[in-house]
């Protein structure tokens, strides 16, 4: 039996170094599917430790195609998997934040557990998805936003894809994506499906010395800042950790309706995002987009508070800035350099 599997079966936890070695073995296909399934199942049942997660992250980053990042880029990649079928809030908020001046490196994928993944909705919006690291950097420099399609940067994940699919439940890999941005973003807004997992991820990420990261987990189950319930926030900034709760009314939002945010397909999600940018959507959809874009603007260092960031995001949408940015992002490379 694999020695790490034996340790887990015996009820022991792994050191960060052991977890790193274990993940390296998974990424290099040096374990059988049943060994991987056994370990992932035990970890999911007992819960990972911060040391284990930090070791896994270190290995994931080592196996990824990484790019020397641009300074002060922001990622808005969350864990997904909240099961509520909302439109692509983090993708919409990334576009708004980039229109307000934030440099966004949006890390994402096609849908795995949701109705619409970030790559799916960008395709529906006719936004160019960059295919190389150089094109991503160029897009960020030109338009303040680039998209990192996860499979292009984490090719070693193919060795665990089959096992994850067969298991069918959330594993540690749901937590690793947001902590493994290929442009090594030190500023992030990370939506998490539970506050317990948010705390775990924050403890693991602290060892990598982030500049400014917000983990958000709302009490209505969204992995976003919510306008239908209070949201628990863990904020890492310049070596300090703060934990607090925000409510929609503190930011001038009336309590929204969850049904106004739900979609059944990437096409519906894209349609709703376009309506938000054209000031034709429900107040719930507008408010939640501005709230989450505000967090990205704040972590980018453009504003001094989340409230100011949210106000700037609202102004960016209502003034037509977000709609204009969407049109810029639709341009093909040959049009940009013409």
Curated annotation (Swiss-Prot):
GO CC term, one of those recorded: cytosol
UniProt keyword Glycosyltransferase, yes or no: yes
Binding of Mg(2+) 1, residues: 90, 224
Top-rank EC class of the record's enzyme: transferase
Family per similarity comment: Belongs to the anthranilate phosphoribosyltransferase family.
Residues noted as binding Mg(2+) 2 in the record, renumbered to the chain: 223-224
GO biological process: L-tryptophan biosynthetic process
Required cofactor(s): Mg(2+)
Binding annotation for anthranilate 1: 78, 109
Known role: Catalyzes the transfer of the phosphoribosyl group of 5-phosphorylribose-1-pyrophosphate (PRPP) to anthranilate to yield N-(5'-phosphoribosyl)-anthranilate (PRA).
Subunit structure: Homodimer.
Cofactor note: Binds 2 magnesium ions per monomer.
Residues bound to anthranilate 2: 164
Keyword set, alphabetical order: Amino-acid biosynthesis, Aromatic amino acid biosynthesis, Glycosyltransferase, Magnesium, Metal-binding, Transferase, Tryptophan biosynthesis
EC number: 2.4.2.18
Catalytic activity field: N-(5-phospho-beta-D-ribosyl)anthranilate + diphosphate = 5-phospho-alpha-D-ribose 1-diphosphate + anthranilate
InterPro entries: Anthranilate_Pribosyl_Tfrase, Glycosyl_Trfase_fam3, Glycosyl_Trfase_fam3_N_dom, Glycosyl_Trfase_fam3_N_dom_sf, Nuc_phospho_transferase
Domain of life: Bacteria
GO function terms (MF aspect): anthranilate phosphoribosyltransferase activity; magnesium ion binding
Residues annotated for 5-phospho-alpha-D-ribose 1-diphosphate binding in this entry: 78, 81-82, 86, 88-91, 106-114, 118
Gene name per UniProt: trpD
Pathway(s) served: Amino-acid biosynthesis; L-tryptophan biosynthesis; L-tryptophan from chorismate: step 2/5
Protein known as: Anthranilate phosphoribosyltransferase
């Amino acid at each position: 039996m694999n020695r790490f599997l034996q340790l887990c079966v015996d009820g022991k936890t792994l050191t960060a170094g052991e977890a790193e070695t274990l993940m390296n073995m998974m990424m290099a296909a040096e374990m059988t599917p049943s060994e991987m399934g056994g370990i992932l199942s035990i970890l999911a049942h007992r819960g990972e430790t911060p040391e284990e997660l930090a070791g896994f992250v270190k290995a994931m980053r080592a196996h990824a195609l990484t790019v020397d990042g641009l300074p002060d880029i922001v990622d808005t990649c969350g864990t997904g998997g909240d099961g509520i079928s909302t439109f692509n809030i983090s993708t919409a908020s990334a576009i708004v934040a980039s229109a307000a001046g934030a440099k966004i490196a949006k890390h994402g994928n096609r849908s795995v557990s949701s109705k619409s993944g970030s790559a799916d909705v960008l395709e529906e919006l006719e936004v160019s998805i960059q295919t190389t690291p150089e094109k991503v950097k160029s897009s960020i420099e030109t338009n303040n936003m680039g998209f990192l399609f996860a499979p292009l940067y984490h090719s070693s994940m193919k060795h665990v894809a089959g096992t994850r699919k067969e298991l069918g439940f959330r594993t540690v890999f749901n937590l690793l994506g947001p902590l493994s941005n290929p442009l090594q973003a030190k500023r992030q807004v990370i939506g998490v499906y539970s506050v317990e997992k948010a705390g775990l991820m924050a403890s693991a990420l602290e060892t990598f010395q982030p500049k400014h990261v917000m983990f958000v987990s709302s009490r209505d189950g969204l992995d976003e800042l919510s306008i239908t319930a209070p949201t628990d926030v863990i904020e890492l900034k310049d070596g300090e950790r703060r934990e607090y709760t925000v409510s929609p009314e503190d930011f001038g939002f009336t309590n929204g309706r969850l049904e106004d945010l739900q979609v059944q397909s990437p096409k519906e999600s894209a349609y709703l995002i376009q309506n938000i940018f054209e000031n034709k959507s429900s107040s719930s959809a507008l408010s939640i987009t501005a709230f989450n874009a505000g967090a990205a603007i704040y972590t980018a260092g453009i504003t001094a508070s989340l409230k100011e960031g949210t106000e700037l995001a609202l102004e960016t949408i209502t003034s037509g800035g977000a709609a204009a940015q969407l049109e810029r992002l639709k341009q093909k490379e040959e049009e940009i350099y013409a």
